[in-house]
A protein has these predicted regions:
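A short, N-terminal "cap"/entry segment at the start of jelly-roll beta-barrel domains
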Residues: 1-10
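N-terminal regulatory/effector-sensing and dimerization cores
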Residues: 9-108
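Non-catalytic effector/regulatory segments
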Residues: 12-16, 37-39, 63, 90-93, ...
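Aromatic/histidine-rich interaction motifs
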Residues: 102-127
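Short, Lys/Arg-enriched, Trp-marked, Pro/Gly-tolerant hinge/linker segments that flank
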Residues: 113-118, 135-145, 152-192, 196-197, ...
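Acidic, glycine-rich flexible loop segments
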Residues: 130-133
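Key DNA-contact positions within bacterial/archaeal DNA-binding proteins
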Residues: 202
Length: 217
């Protein structure tokens, strides 16, 4: 399943009274937005498309960069909701990036094999702040500073800021999404998008392929 919704919906499978040692596996999850995950009663094993493996323990906060594709294994360790997830929209992300940019002291030190997933242990204050950002109708300024606080706990702060900066750039997939969302009553075909963008259908497909995406008429 190639969607960040898979990870959000995975919470439905573990609602209610779940005994420990339950395991859930999802393949090729794409995060179309940056996400912060709070692991409450679970351990998350992440495998990236380049073969890297990241083991994230319970009582941790994890940040995942936009457009990251991963396989996940969730080991549920106790009863109740094992984790919560918060997706950061692009407007909020841009503001967070501006706040944290001064922390990027040596941008040239960040190599091509930079990290896209970050995590840190969460204390009581962190869990309370995470709960606040997931509440309804939180003012944007509070979201920005609360998320910034959580992200500032990461050890490799310069790599994190670089990741935030990369994620603020709009992808071709996002541009297509905005066009489609401008008129949801329309059954969009590839030829329609080609007309709007003044591009050939072949060019659109190639750009999507570069982002590991496709368009199904």
């Amino acid at each position: 399943m190639n969607s960040q919704n898979a990870l959000s919906n995975m919470r439905l499978a573990v609602r209610g009274d779940i005994s420990g040692n339950s395991t859930l596996v999802l393949k090729k999850i794409r995060f179309y937005n940056c996400a912060i995950i709070y692991l409450r009663n679970a351990q998350l094993l992440v495998k990236t498309i380049d073969g890297g493996v990241i083991n994230i323990p319970a009582e941790s906060i994890c940040y995942i960069e936009k457009n990251t594709v991963i396989d996940v294994t969730l080991n549920v360790l106790g009863k109740g909701m094992p984790y919560d997830i918060f997706h950061i929209d692009n407007n909020i992300l841009s503001c967070i990036c501006k706040v944290m940019e001064p922390l990027l002291l040596n941008p040239h030190k960040i190599g091509p094999m930079r990290s896209r997933i970050f995590n840190c242990m969460a204390d009581k204050t962190d869990t309370e702040i995470f709960k606040m950002i997931t509440e309804a109708n939180v003012p944007n300024h509070r979201l920005i500073y609360n998320i910034t606080y959580l992200l500032s706990k990461v050890d490799d702060i310069e790599s994190l800021v670089c990741s935030l900066s990369v994620s603020t750039d709009s992808t071709f997939t996002e541009k297509l999404k905005l066009i489609i969302e401008s008129d949801l009553s329309k059954s969009w075909r590839l030829v329609d998008l080609a007309n709007v963008l003044h591009m050939s259908e072949v060019s659109i497909r190639k750009k999507l392929e570069k982002e590991n995406n496709n368009f199904n008429n």
